Structures are given as C-alpha cells and as structure tokens.
Amino acid sequence: SVCPDLYTYNTGTLLQAAVALYNYTGEQAYLDNAKFLAEGSYKVFFKYTEDGIPYIADLPWFNLVLFRGYHDLYNVTGDSKYVDTMIKGLDYAWEHARDQAGLMYHDWTGRTDEKRKPKWLLDASCVPEYYARVAMIKGEVTNRKNK
C-alpha cells in the first residue's frame, strides 16, 4: 500500500533534483517540473496563523530541505515567492518562538510555550543553514561555488 503521509523533505529533494537537472541539461521540462513542485508544495504545506504568519506543520529540518529546493529554484528564476514566504515565517519564529538559550521551538508560530521543553536536534540544528541561505538570497554573502 502507498503511505498517504506528506513530508516537506520528500518534495524538497525532488525539487532540488529537478533544478539540478535543468542546470546540467538546460532542458525546459526539468524547470517546468521544478516550478510545478514548488507551487504544489506551496499550496499543500503552507498554513497561516490568524495574524497571517506563514508556517509549515512539519519538522523544521524537513522544511529546510524544501527551503533548499526553493532557494535553488530562486537562483534560476529570480521568483522570490517561495523563499520570501519561508523567510517571513523564519523571522517571526526568531522573534517569537525561542527559549532563553536562543533555541528555536518545534512550533515556529510561537503559539505554544516551549521554553522549558527539551529541544530536539532536528528542530534547532537547521537554523544556521536557514540563515546562511537567507544571507545568500539577500546578497549579504556569496556562495563560493557560484563565483
């Protein structure tokens, strides 16, 4: 039987692969597939709080894999829709969903108080890569591979 569960890292992996194949071959079909995956994942995974803050109800590290795919697609198309949405949620979490040690909560909406809850590696260890990618997207740092 087929498992009906949907995970952001699966889509992110396929999205990254589609962009990589487009970059290597120049075949439009791969870019079209990447755009299809990006828009489909955007519609399926993103939810919004009452205040309009975007979030994805999955593990933050799993969401990072999707963000990698969005970042790769952004580098090709220049369309910031997907990366901007994730950055908005990330920045909100940075301000509203961290404990006294600065570690991010599992729930990036800040709707649950996780200050005293032990943190899980998959929730906290992804944050530096998120912000490294944000810095690349904003042009604050360069990716040495792309020089």
What is each PLM-predicted segment?
Residues 1-17, 60-64:
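Structured, solvent-exposed acidic/aromatic patches
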Residues 6, 31-147:
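CBM-like carbohydrate-recognition segments
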Residues 21-28:
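Inter-helical turn/loop segments and adjacent helix faces that build the functional surface
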